[in-house]
């Protein structure tokens, strides 16, 4: 699930093959759906947003009720990259974020649980409510992900864009920010390089978060809108985190500064 950043103007395509070296003006976009496995409605919406729309990547909550079924469904779509959505604050297990040892142990456990469910390492790691960006936790995440050579959201040379979200100030719903028109404006504004656009689609049965369930259907509608897929095809090259090795051959020596825009 997403914690909305401060509202700022963002400058953020479809699956064209990546067969040539990256040029300085190339625009690559990962469209990642958070909360895979949270429940059946959320998982179905994510799979549909990939099959019929522009979603190229998802992040799995390994301890949630639909995790195993969601992973099975994802395997039927080989171009859908699946990463780990680390959760310390939702689900059956919670962690005291002030206890660094407990945080590390739980992160390692969730990584191993992901491998158990999928048979492979996650394409990337991100986290519920962006806890991996907390100053006291970021070094732990960075060190563990580097040791396993797994990209970490916001710390792997990919610009993170969190503006496609329907809830902003004081929890007020703003459907304008999950409309097809707004999504198209983000796509045409993508800057050169590699970017990630976060999203949270679901179908009408999504029940993961009472504060943000029915909005997921509006996200799904936008992500699968034919106008959006056309604009994406013309504006960017859609990729997932598996493609980073061809585009960013060496990880940055220092962790990039995480930015919500």
Give names to the regions the model predicted.
Residues 2-30, 40-118, 124, 132-261:
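Terminal accessory/targeting
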Residues 33-36:
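DG-centered beta-turn motif at the end of beta-strands
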